Design a protein with these regions (language model features):
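Active-site donor/metal-binding and catalytic loop motifs
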Residues: 18, 193-213
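Short, acidic, metal-binding catalytic loop of nucleotide-sugar glycosyltransferases
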Residues: 21-30
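A conserved acidic beta->alpha catalytic loop
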Residues: 22, 37-46, 90
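Conserved donor nucleotide-binding strand/loop of the catalytic core
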Residues: 48-74
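Short beta-strand-to-loop acidic/aromatic patch adjacent to the donor-nucleotide binding site
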Residues: 80-89
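Conserved donor NDP-sugar-binding/catalytic core segment of glycosyltransferases
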Residues: 95-125
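A short, conserved alpha-helix in the catalytic core of glycosyltransferases
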Residues: 152-153, 157-160, 164-169, 174-199
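Non-catalytic, C-terminal membrane-associated alpha-helical segments of glycosyltransferases
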Residues: 216-224, 235-291
């Protein structure tokens, strides 16, 4: 059984080093540790050249979505049985992979339990209501169980078997960032009981209180609505309900015109502009890198 792990990175060399170090310490042996370098300009290229135990793939910046798509493609085509996906600002505990693989007979797609650096569990990224285009929070009660069923996952620690990749393909690089893992996990859940493993712990760099307002992220969240709608049509045979579309339009208009009044003026303007541009580019059905 061959287990491949890959990390997608872009201009976060100091964090990448920490992630790689945590993977080198895994109690379950990794057959191939790979880095997808999304065109970093912070010295990552030179540092990675010196690492003898890594497989490195350099490419232009195709966003997280393009990086994860390339990583899954590489691992699958190279014969991996299990593929573990990792971002460059998360640090799995030493037994994380071992804990995931304890349940490999139960599920062919398993999710690590993500925690903020201050010890609070991450409640998002595990359950998605496609009919409402709504991501539900996970309650703390779920963590009383060794594992529990979810219907989507996050590329921060998702472990997937090649048989599922054969059925659903590679992650969709058109998203560039955000929603790519949500839709990929949702597709996987149609073919296996996707579970979150409580003791497969993965720690994030950020704390729970570090809420960051990102024009970049917000743009793609709004722009990618049309791609999520495309998935809804493919899976259910129908587009998002009219109510969902109206809520999206109202949210875009509100946040681009009067939203984020609590932010300082410069950031507030950037957030509003990004959301408006994301809304317009959604109507134009733009894909890949557009911001």
């Amino acid at each position: 059984m061959k287990v491949y792990v890959f990390i997608v990175t872009y201009n976060r060399l100091s964090l990448l080093k920490k992630t790689i170090n945590s993977l080198r310490k895994q109690t379950y042996p990794i057959d191939n540790l790979c880095v997808i370098n999304n065109g970093s300009t912070d010295g990552a290229y030179e540092w990675l050249l010196e690492q003898q135990d890594l497989t490195v793939i350099h490419q232009e910046n195709l966003g997280g979505a393009g990086g994860f798509s390339r990583g899954v493609q590489y691992a699958y085509e190279d014969g991996a049985d299990w593929i573990w996906m990792m971002d460059d600002d998360v640090y799995p505990e030493s037994n994380c992979l071992e804990q995931l693989l304890k349940y490999k007979e139960h599920s062919l797609c398993l999710q690590s339990a993500r925690y903020f650096s201050d010890g609070i569990y991450v409640p998002w990224g595990y359950r998605y209501d496609l009919s409402r285009d709504f991501e539900e929070k996970i309650s703390a009660d779920n963590y009383k169980k060794e594992f529990f069923s979810v219907n989507t996952g996050c590329f921060e620690g998702m472990l997937i078997h090649r048989s599922i990749v054969a059925k659903i393909g590679y992650p969709d690089k058109r998203f560039f960032i955000t929603s790519d893992d949500r839709m990929y996990g949702y597709l996987a859940s149609k073919h296996t009981d996707l579970i979150l493993v409580r003791d497969a712990r993965l720690n994030r760099e950020a704390t729970f209180g570090e809420v960051k307002y990102s024009p970049f992220y917000s743009y793609y969240l709004y722009r990618n609505f049309h791609l999520r709608d495309e998935y809804c049509k493919a899976i259910t045979g129908k587009s998002f309900p009219l109510k969902v579309k109206m809520m999206y339009v109202l949210s875009a208009l509100k946040n681009s015109l009067i939203g984020y009044s609590f932010l300082e003026p410069s950031l507030r303007k950037k957030m509003r502009t990004a959301i408006w541009k994301g809304f317009v580019d959604c109507l134009r059905k733009k894909e890949n890198k557009t911001f």
